[in-house]
Amino acid sequence: MRFLRFLKIFFTVIRFGLDEMMLSRVNDRRVRLLLRITTIGRKFDQPPGVRLRLALESLGPIFVKFGQVLSTRRDLLRPDIATELAKLQDQVPPFDSAVAIAIIEKSLGAPVDTIFDDFERVPVASASIAQVHFATLKIGQHAGKQVAVKVLRPNMLPVIDSDLALLRDIAVWAERLWADGKRLKPREVVAEFDKYLHDELDLMREAANGSQLRRNFAGLDLLLVPEMYWEYCTANVLVMERMVGVPISQVDTLRVAGVDIPKLAREGVEIFFTQVFRDGFFHADMHPGNIQVSLDPAHFGRYIALDFGIIGALSDFDKNYLAQNFLAFFKRDYHRVATLHLESGWVPATTRVEELESAIRAVCEPYFDRALKDISLGQVLMRLFSTSRRFNVEIQPQLVLLQKTMLNVEGLGRSLDPELDLWKTAKPYLERWMNEQIGAKGWYERLKIEAPQWSKTLPQLPRLIHHVLAQRHDAQQRGINDETIRQILLEQKRTNRLLQGLLMFGVAVGVGAVLARAWLAIAYGGY
């Protein structure tokens, strides 16, 4: 079976001329000679990106998904190919509703007719991973509620694991034979895709993501997120509140209904940056199919978010990297941008900041030939990643996911309002987050969180200092290889951060003690 699947992939590659695209970059002369022979008489009118998209579509939904993930890696692909892959549509015929009902009944342990009224056998939506049916809950505390029932496709795991095994084999060969193999890191891309697919196969995980997003926006008049009905959620079935809205792509319908379109565009950007900088938890699949707008008088003009299979998470370190990079970029302070990359610890310690600064200036300066409102933050981030790749920077998957989502949000906002000023909308969020981190309130909050750990580690400070100095001395004496030195330097940088924190804590404790004693002296007339 696996061999037959491999043959299909092989003949698809030949049919669409992908062998010409890939093997022309192979180092082996014999392979290049074979390529010349096999391409005699073949001519392709369509550009490479179109041929790659058509080939992935012909190979089925798993490869379509792979192409969609690949399209987000604009730090690796040529822009024309990435743009073409972004057109891939995850639309497949629905599976038999009788099979869907059998899965629901097995997962929930009861006949569908006892759980739901008016279960619609024709699915309202169908994709490669699951399909959705509308129904009304019949029992329990939510009886009478209209719901959407998402059902995982049957027997998906064996198919996915088989195709992933083939993709892993192809990635290994590509890395060995292809001149661009090491730069494009095919095994890394396939591993990322593996995680992405298996995350989507767990509907309990998706329900948890949706529940978290709903909780984050509770009390904010910005975004509606469906309630998850946990008693009816399993790994194969997800039952959530049915949301009624107009797809965001139907702009004319929204305008006729009286929705303020420019305001809608601004609020979309506000929702995104609230998720990124306030919560560090963002919906990472914000294409038009997953976004609607409510026309219900109680929630008129509010966004509705659907499908929570892909979620991104950012640490405070990630948020600081983003905020400082964007602020430095718009000040055209390229030295600061380069320094931030080095300080992140993701850049080899041997990198010269001046070289990185020069490369960043070369890709960023042309952006300022246009109005600030026309600058794409997603494109800026993408160009920074592409430049960083040349310096062997460790690309962070969470930031790549953010960059892809940012491009979607920008495209959505500008399709609603071509005059949308993304920087003007985003800047207050960046500055507010920076002020909260640097200001007294932010310092106090971090102190409350870190103080217990620091109090345990502070007595170890002399030993840590001795350990750092000994590491550097040993490295110089033993003449160890560059990679080991790089790892030691990275570890040293992390240790230095800890030492700085400990010293700050020690100073804070000392100053606090002095002030407390001074206050007692003033209050009680002496020590």
UniProtKB/Swiss-Prot annotation:
CDD domains reported for this sequence: UbiB
Binding site for ATP: 124-132, 150
Residues covered by the Protein kinase domain: 118-501
Compartments, as annotated in UniProt: Cell inner membrane
Signal peptide: none
Keyword tags: ATP-binding, Cell inner membrane, Cell membrane, Kinase, Membrane, Nucleotide-binding, Transferase, Transmembrane, Transmembrane helix, Ubiquinone biosynthesis
Enzyme class: transferase
This protein's name: Probable protein kinase UbiB
Natural source organism: Paraburkholderia phymatum (strain DSM 17167 / CIP 108236 / LMG 21445 / STM815)
Name of encoding gene: ubiB
